[in-house]
Amino acid sequence: MVAGGPFHYYLERLCEHYALSIHGVGMSIGAEGALDTEHLQRLNVLLARYQPASFSEHLAWSTHGPCFLNDLLPLQYDQQTLNRVCEHIDQVQNTLGRRMLLENPATYLQFNASTFDEPTFIREVVRRTGCGMLLDVCNVYVSCINHQWSTQEYLQALPLHETAEIHLAGFSEAFDRNGQRLLIDSHSAPVAAAIWSLYQQILEHTGPVATLIERDNELPGLAVLLAEARRAQAYLDNHGVQP
């Protein structure tokens, strides 16, 4: 979020042709401590400059005291965490003067002390803060496989009508120390058949929603990426007007 440089040059050119979606990874919405107000103010300047169609952050934490951990870490889903997350989202939305979208996480462990399941927790956050939802379909699938949850029950518990953006991605596979299959939200593979299937099912409830395909590692040729984009667009076209 620097003031100048090549990133801004290219963003300004992109803004001439496309609406932007700005996606944050460093707000640490779930942290026990206070939000970084300097980070929040820099973000406010960035959003004022580009006026994106949407801004989103993750349901996760990445800070503890003065330490920044370069990862999106899971939360214990209890009343105290719910209150804290809602307070932080209220602070973000009040500072930015806009609605924030909250992305569901991909997780690899659960806390025994949690008193909410994940989709119920997300639903309560959305209800209390008025934030929207960024529904990451790959994260839904990864978490449900890793924790042996039902994808159907998970989706049914979410406020799908509040979905304002959708992410699709591929995952990688590993095994834990007990030999159990473990999915990793690596963004390093094509969108899997199971993700496409869930995406079509979700669109039946949401209608056409702005969709992003994420690919960070093991990048294929451009033709492969464009083919995935065309596939997503075809599903969107089947469910109404292009977003």
Predicted regions mapped to residue ranges:
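Acidic-and-aromatic substrate-binding clefts and catalytic sites of carbohydrate-active enzymes
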Residues: 1-7, 28-38, 108-116, 141-148, ...
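Hydrophobic faces of well-ordered beta-strands that scaffold small-molecule active sites
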Residues: 18-23, 53-57, 100-103, 133-135, ...
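Active-site acidic/histidine proton-transfer and metal-coordination neighborhood
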Residues: 36-132
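Acidic/histidine-rich catalytic cores of soluble enzymes
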Residues: 93, 98-178
